[in-house]
Structure formats: structure tokens, C-alpha cells
Amino acid sequence: MARFFIDRPIFAWVIAICIMFAGGLSISQLPLEQYPNIAPPTVKISATYTGASAKTVEDSVTQVIEQQMKGLDRLTYMSASSSSAGSASINLTFAAGTDPDVAQMQVQNKLQQAESRLPQSVQSEGLTVTKGSSDFLMLVALASDNESVTGTQIGDYISSTLLDQLSRIDGVGDVQTLGSGYAMRIWLDPARLEKYALMPSDISSALEAQNTEVSAGQLGALPAVTGQQLNATISARSKLQTPEQFENVVVKSSSDGAVVLLRDVARVELGSESYDINSALNGRPAAAMGIQLASGANALSVGEAIKAKLKELEPFYPTQMQLKTVIAYDTTPFVSLSIKEVVKSLGEAIVLVVLIMFLFMQNLRATLIPAITVPVVLLGTFGVLALFGYSINTLTMFAMVLAIGLLVDDAIVVVENVERVMSEEQLSPLEATRKSMDEITSALIGIALVLSAVFIPMAFFSGSTGIIYRQFSVTIVSAMLLSVLVAMTLTPALCATMLKASDAQLHAQRGGFFGWFNRSFDRSADRYQRGVSGVINHRGRALLVYVLVLVAMAVGYVSLPTSFLPDEDQGALMAQIQLPVGATDSRTQAVMRQFETYMLKQPEVEALISISGLGMGGNSQNTARAFIKLKDWSERSGKGQGAAQVAQRATLALSSIGDASVFVMQPPAVRGLGQSSGFDVQLKDLGGVGHEALVAAREQFIELAKKDPSLLGVRSNGLDDTPQLKVTIDDRK
């Protein structure tokens, strides 16, 4: 095979150029991400049962939906939560590799079968099925420089204008409005209702009947009478818009012509649709959008599309509101930085390899031959990644960095052996190359097979570990196989055409720096040879040292801490604020002000968005979350300015707040695997002992975990049972 390309160097160049061309075209098509898509596909069902307790939501909504989710293909597990705010959430996790669109369709079909058994109010308020991870890709906050603009006004603009625009971006799983728009609020007066013998249901019926769109048809519509001269659309009643229109709704009328209007029994005002969640940007009222990534979508491309859409919409913001867009939490810059750093390391590795080759070969032509093979093999590897549907991520790039040293070895072996044959047998470069390839072709293939046998098994790992290392394995194996291919095609052709017989004689005659280096290297080689001879002469002592080294390695392996992936400074932090059960929103807001005051004083913090009422385990008045955007890494290069150090200091300092527990933490190392750094543990009532016993077991487990010195920040992400006021209805009265 090698002789064929030695005699046809142009054909070897054509193959190399085709490999480079295919790889170069593939680079622009490959997605960029920090890690392979490790998180399994998830589908989330959300429902709202306004006014219901957590127990009622669980019995009449959550369990009904859970019981229907049977027979779903590749469903791994399912979790659900019910809150006293009347919300229910069911998360279904599927096996890795499942098509998220198919999973969502199957869940939607199952949900339709359960809808008839759900309360009417749940059906009317709607059930949503979304595919995506539970954590946020980014948080986009809108704030105003005009102090008269309220968070409700901003939230109403987001709901009416921005929400649909961003939801339609490819790769966006869900857009959650962290604020509220306008709604007409009707405050009933019980005394007046009793005076006019009215019930709240009468008010609801009147509103449903009169707050409607009426289709009145057309004037002169076909078939028309003979001589009809005008055709026009008739507009009648439309939906009510102002408080005055609602006040004039007739809620009761009598035969004598007397009517009771809504304003006679209630106070009508324009207010916020919901007061459950309130957002603040750097302590000022705002509204935000929490954008979640769809399962299988690429974070970088989706993030760029969102930013482009926001930039496109900014000129159309209402001028009187003076709105400004702030991306207060963004997970994509760290991904871009990670890829850039790995690409930088790849470039540095290439330069160092070329310099080291020149240092030892001391021949520009001989150095140039292995250097040419590097871009050919690397670009070809990108083509293989595209063929397998992989991405450019830190693991595939790390595999390429590691492969550089391996792939130049093949070319160096060929070049060195050709020079040796030319020097020892006084052959021409062409003949020396032919003879050299006859000698080492089998060795090149053998080396490739041995190295492949080391890395190929990693491609067959199961679970998340397999997903992580499969791309690493395929990348490094494909680079090595391409390296052998190039070493048997292009490298011999280059040796036969570029090397000169005179170059093989110059190595021993070098002077200057290279002469000094050669003499120093020869002395080092002599000392090494004498050392090896000494080891051979004292085998017992050498074997003892070898055993001690093995023992030291084993001890080090056992004692080193282990983790799935290391926690890195992603340029962002999260905080969970939890108040005692039953605490009101005013108490939560007071704690949030203390939290904001502390965090905004920290020199590492750039922006802070705080959201009261939003919790990791559910929404309630006594919980809140915050997302902290840190300054660029170049501005936090000092000691103690890393994200982990900032989080530890903040958690310690804010522990003095007696009315709340505050935990500041880093985002999860891998998107979609948890809501924060560390790991989650869930307890399951397999014995059916009941809710109270399960809560008691949870508290006992947390206390035991806090005593473990290897654990930090042990906490409950769920909401405790809220106080309930039971009303007993006397049906006779």
C-alpha cells in the first residue's frame, strides 16, 4: 500500500486534501457545547388548581395524572410535587437517547385520557406539557429607569409581547414569566351580597354571560334580498376592558325594571393577575423571564438566538416605559470560555510539538513532514465527529489535545527510519522510503490497534458515564486511525519527495546550540544507560522500589476525593432563601432586602435578580430564590474571588439572619442534572407509612447528614407543610 502512494505522491496529496476539506466543512456544522448531552430527556406536566390545598391537589390532580402515565416507552422514573399554592408538577424522565418530541407526544396523549377525571377548574385553567430541563438556561430581566413604572406593567408587557416571541425560538423548552400581568380584580362585599340575596356564583355567571365576544354577522350577507346595496360586518359586544365597564355589569334584575350592578356589591380595580411571585433587579422592581432549554437542544446556539431576538425587539419597546434588558443570569458564557481555553491549549500543544520535533530532528524538511500531518488528521477527526452526530465540546477537544502527541509519533517513526536507512545504506530518499515502509508498516498498524484497544472499550460504558466518555473515545481512536492512514499514504510520499540524502549526514556534525544539545543529550543517555545497568544488577532492590511505588499509587487512589465532574467557576451563583412555615410575603421581602444589600456590596457581583415566592421545591410566600451574575473572570483574578469562595462567604455571613436560612451555591456542573451543585437525595415511602412519618424520616436523615464532615450545605429543597385553617360547612344552614 505504501509503495503505491510513494510512486503516486499527487494521489496521496489528493486524499489528504479531501480529508481536510471534509473536516473543514464539518467544523461549521458541529454544535458547540461544554459537555455532551448527558441529561436524560424530561417532560414536565404543570397544572393549577386555584385555592386548593396541597393535599387536595395531590388527591384530585397529581395522583390522577400519575396513574394515567402507564405504558410510556423508555420511561425511567417519574416524580411529582403538589404545593399549597394550588400548583402541581409532574416530571417524567426518559432513558438517554429517547426522542424528546416522541416522549412529549406520548405524554400528551396519556394526559388527554386523564383530563375528564380532573376538576373542571383545572381543565379550564389549562394543563401544559413541556419538554426541557428543570433549571434555567438564562434569566432575562426587564427594568425601567422610570420609577413610576411598576413591575406589574413590565410583567404585562412581557406576557403580551415578548413571551410568544421567545417561546417560538427553536430549542427553547419553556419560558416562565417571573412576574405578573394585569387582571381585573373584583372585591365582593359580603354584606351587600346578603342584602341583594346574591351568591358569588351569581357574580361569576353574570360575568361569563356579559364579558363575551358576540358575533353578530353581516348586513347584506348572501343570500340577500333583491336590491340590497350595502354589505357590512356588524360589530356588537366585545370583551370588557376597563373597570367602569365591569362595574356596569348587571348581576340581578327584577320584573319591575330594577337592576343590581356589579358596582353595587363589589369594588372593581385593575391589579396584578397574581401576587405570588415578585421580581427585583438589583433591588429595584422588575419582571423577568426564566428560559429553559428543550431536551437535546444546544445551549450556545439557543442562547445566541435569544440574545439576537432581544436585540431585534429592543427598538420597539414602549418609549414611555424606558425599559432596559438585562441578562441577569446566563450559563452560556462559561461554555464559550471553556471551548476557547481548550482550543487555545490545542494550539499551544501543536506549537510545542513542532518545536520539540525541530529540536530533536534539527532538520526543517524532516520537521515539516510530521507538522503537515497534524492539520490533516485533526480536520479529518472533525469530519468523523460530524459523521457520528457529535459536537465540539471540552471532552472531544481534550481528546484531540491528547491525540496530537500520538499522531505525530507515527509520522516521526516514518521520517526517522527513512533517515536511518539513507544514512546507513547510502540510498536515495525514494529507495530509502520504500525499504523503510516495508520494515515498519506492520509496526504502525500494530501500534494503532494496541492504542485503539485501550480507548475503544470506553465507548461502550453505560449510563451518563458512557455518554461522557463515548465521544472522547471515538475522537481519540478516530484520530489515531487517521494518523496511521496518513502515515502510510501522505508521509511516505513526502519523505520520498522532500528529504535529501545529504540531510541524514548532518545530524552528527552540528555545531552551536544544536551541537551543545546533542552532546548534553548523549551524556544524559549514557547516564541513563548506566542507571539501567545498575537496576539490572540489583533486581531485588529495584523490585522493592517498584512495589512501594505501586502501594503509594494505590493509597493515593483510595485517598483522593471522587466526584462525577468538578465544580467550576461558571461566573454565576444561585441562592435559596427559606423562612419558617407560614411566614408571609412581607417577612420574605424583608429578608430579601438584607440579602440584596449584602450581595450588591460584594466587589465580585455584577447583577442580582431576586424572586420572592419561587422555591426549588415549590412556590410559597415563605420562600425565595436569587440568581447572581458575577463579573468577568478577568476582573476576579485575585485570591478568594472565585465563585466557590464568594458563595461560602455569603452563606456564612447571611447565616446571621435569624428569621431565615440562606444558602448560596454554584449552578450544577452539568445542565439538567440537578438544580445546583452537589447531589440530590429523594426519600420514598415504600412501606406506606404515611406523609407525617416520611417528613419525620426526612428530618432525621438531614440531621444525620449534617454530622458527616464530608457533607456541606445539607438542606431540604422541599416545602414544609403549611398551617391550615379548616372550615366545617353546615349543610343544613
Predicted features along the sequence, with ranges:
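Hydrophobic regular secondary-structure detector
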Residues: 1-111, 275-649, 653, 665-666
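A short glycine-centered flexible hinge/capping loop motif at secondary-structure junctions
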Residues: 196-197, 582, 733
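Short glycine/threonine-rich beta-strand-turn micro-motifs
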Residues: 88-92, 182-194, 288-291, 680, ...
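Acidic/polar active-site rim loop that often engages polyanionic ligands
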Residues: 135-143, 186, 228-229, 284, ...
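Short, polar/charged loop or turn motifs at beta-strand boundaries
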Residues: 47, 53-55, 151, 188-193, ...
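Short acidic/polar micro-motifs at solvent-exposed secondary-structure junctions
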Residues: 91-92, 146, 184-189, 195, ...
